[in-house]
C-alpha cells in the first residue's frame, strides 16, 4: 500500500507563518464570501419570488452558493489547522474537514465547467453536427446535469472517509535538550485510494472545462481576426469586448488548473503540514473561487449594475442608522 507519512511539531510553524496564512487566505475567503454571497442573494431573490431563472443564471446561483459554503468551510479549516491543532488532528475531525472540502471543491469544479460549457455553446460558432445538437439540447438537459454533478461529487468524496487518511497526536515526545516533552502530529495518506477517488471526481469536469474554454477562445479569436480584417479597428467596442473575453477566459483557465493541482497536493500531504509549499496551496485554493466570483460580477452587466446600486445604498443605510 503506497502511503505518504508526515509529522510536525508546534515548533515547525512560526507565528509569522500562522499570521501570514490567516491574513492572506482570510482576505481571499472574505472577498469570495462577499462576491459569492452577493451573486447568491441576487439570483436567490429572483428564484424566491417565483421567477424562472434563465439557464445561465441558474448555473450561476448553484455555483455561487456552493462557493459561499466552500469559502466559509476553508476559512474554518485554516483557523482550526493553524490555531486549534490538537482538535484538528483528531482523526474524525480531520477526515470530516477533508471529505467536505473535496465534496465542495468537486461540486464547484463541476458547476464552473458547466457554466463554461453553456457559454461556449451560446457564444462560440462551429459548423459541426454534434455542436449544433448540444446547442439545442443544453437548456433542457442542464438542470439534470447539475443534479448529477452533485451526486457524482458526493460519490467520489464520501469514500475518502475510509482507508485514506489517518492522523493522530503524540503528546509525550521527549525533547533531548531538556526534561520536557512536546506534541507531535502524525498523518498518513493512502495515495492509491486518494489518487483514484480524486482523479475520478475531477477528471471529467477538468477536461470539459479545458475543452470548452479552448473552443471559446478559438471562436472569439477567429471572430476578432475577422473583425480586424474588415478594418473595424481595435477601438471598436465589440472588438474590445471580444479581446476582454479572451483574456478573462484564458486567465480563469489557468486559475482553474492551478486550483485543481493545489487541491490535490494539499489533500495528499506530500508537503509537510506547515511548510511554505502547503501554505501556498492553501492560498491558491482560496484565490481561485474568490477571483472568479469577482470576475463574474465585473463581467456580467446585470450583476455589475446591481453591485453599483448596492455600493450606493450601503452608505445611505449606514448614515440612516447613525441618525
Curated annotation (Swiss-Prot):
Topological domain ranges for the Cytoplasmic compartment: 36-58, 122-140, 212-247, 298-323
Q: Which residues are glycosylated?
A: 170, 179
Q: How does it sit in the membrane?
A: Multi-pass membrane protein
One GO term in the molecular function aspect is: bitter taste receptor activity
Q: List residues traversing the bilayer.
A: 15-35, 59-79, 101-121, 141-162, 191-211, 248-268, 277-297
**Keywords, alphabetical:** G-protein coupled receptor, Glycoprotein, Membrane, Receptor, Sensory transduction, Taste, Transducer, Transmembrane, Transmembrane helix
Q: Which residues lie on this side of the membrane: Extracellular?
A: 1-14, 80-100, 163-190, 269-276
Q: Which cysteines are joined by disulfide bonds?
A: none
Query: Which InterPro entries does this entry report, sorted A to Z?
Result: TAS2R (IPR007960)
Q: Which Gene3D superfamilies does the record cross-reference, listed alphabetically? A: Rhodopsin 7-helix transmembrane proteins (1.20.1070.10)
A single GO cellular-component term on record = plasma membrane
According to its UniProt record, where is this protein located?
Membrane
Q: Which family does it belong to?
A: Belongs to the G-protein coupled receptor T2R family.
Q: What does this protein do?
A: Gustducin-coupled receptor implicated in the perception of bitter compounds in the oral cavity and the gastrointestinal tract. Signals through PLCB2 and the calcium-regulated cation channel TRPM5.
Give the note.
Several bitter taste receptors are expressed in a single taste receptor cell.
> What is this protein called in UniProt?
Taste receptor type 2 member 40
Q: Which organism is it from?
A: Pongo pygmaeus
